[in-house]
């Protein structure tokens, strides 16, 4: 909540400093306690930076394009990391990875002056939208709507956390070759880049809400297909469908919150809700497996999580159509 009150350049500087301090400390001692503290410090710093980034981008008036660029960069960096980390680890060990994180953070200090110091719009429930008959209409948006969007983010990331934690094991349990599984996961990540490009086009044509609802529905179907049976065909279908629509949904979730609240207060909370859900989901899925309910039960749980998010966004969309149609179908 400080993101709307404190100079964002100071917040980002604090986050980057924690990242640098945490990664530098990680190289100094192999002691478990020290390493845990230093990784916690680096993680908090990275979270602060990510939250400040999403809050600042929320002020954009073309949020689908803005967050598509953000997700494109994240996916591209993940692909680079998958390629370069084994090389770094093989040559310099785990300390090499920490140094990589440290060096990666240093150049960001040079772009801090580009960050907006403060939100340019008032935080609260008044959203300025354009109507044909009244170009500066003030519309009252209930605070419950962005909060419901955060609940939907949490629910969807239950799916994400559980799926990523157990999809490889589900493939192995179905006697799918490990090389096939690894290849499908890699190419699925590469394929997901196309989602960031398609999201911009769809947002311009249909707005953000309709593609978001369709993507969540498709994710429900994908999980139910995998719950029915796991073989090579359904496995590769689920990997490519999940990888594509995950990025797709992320763009529109952030974009929807940004259209409702340009202050960035709620968008800055998205990384926290994502992280907590991803930490909680494997435990929940593991409990189902502990009681020998099988991987199909995990996929059904994932389908339910996506269905809950779908229902929440459907309600939010209907309310926005009543209150501010331009916001409901904004790109």
Task: Put a short name on every predicted segment.
Residues 1-30:
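Conserved MFS/SLC helix-loop-helix module at the cytosolic interface between two early adjacent transmembrane helices
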Residues 144-186, 190:
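Extracytoplasmic gate region of multi-pass secondary transporters
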Residues 47-61, 247-261:
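Intracellular juxtamembrane helix-capping segments at the cytosolic ends
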């Amino acid at each position: 909540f400080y993101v709307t009150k404190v100079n964002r350049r100071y917040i980002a500087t604090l986050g980057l400093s924690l990242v640098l301090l945490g990664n530098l400390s990680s190289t100094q001692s192999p002691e478990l306690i020290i390493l845990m503290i230093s990784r916690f410090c680096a993680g908090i710093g990275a979270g602060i930076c990510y939250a400040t980034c999403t809050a600042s981008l929320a002020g954009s008036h073309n949020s689908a394009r803005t967050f598509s660029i953000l997700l494109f960069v994240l996916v591209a960096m993940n692909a680079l990391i998958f390629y370069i980390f084994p090389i770094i680890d093989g040559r310099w060990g785990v300390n090499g990875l920490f140094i990589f994180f440290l060096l990666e953070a240093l150049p960001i200090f040079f772009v801090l002056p580009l960050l907006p110091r403060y939100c340019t719009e008032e935080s609260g429930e008044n959203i300025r939208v354009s109507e044909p008959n009244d170009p500066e209409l003030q519309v009252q948006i209930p605070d419950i709507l962005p909060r419901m969007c955060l609940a939907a983010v949490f629910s969807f990331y239950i799916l994400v956390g559980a799926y990523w934690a157990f999809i490889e094991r589900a493939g192995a349990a179905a006697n799918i070759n490990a090389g096939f599984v690894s290849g499908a996961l890699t190419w699925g990540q590469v394929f997901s880049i196309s989602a960031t490009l398609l999201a911009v086009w769809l947002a311009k044509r249909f707005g953000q809400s309709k593609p978001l609802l369709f993507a969540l529905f498709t994710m429900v179907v994908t999980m139910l297909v995998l719950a029915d049976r796991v073989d090579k065909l359904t496995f590769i279908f689920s990997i490519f469908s999940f990888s594509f629509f995950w990025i797709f949904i992320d763009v529109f979730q952030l974009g929807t919150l940004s259209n409702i609240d340009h202050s960035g207060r709620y968008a800055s909370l998205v990384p926290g809700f994502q992280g907590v859900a991803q930490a909680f989901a494997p435990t929940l899925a593991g409990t189902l497996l502990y009681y020998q309910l099988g991987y199909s039960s995990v996929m059904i749980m994932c389908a339910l999580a996506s269905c809950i998010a779908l229902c929440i966004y459907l309600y939010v969309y209907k309310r926005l159509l009543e209150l501010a149609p331009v916001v409901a179908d904004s790109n």
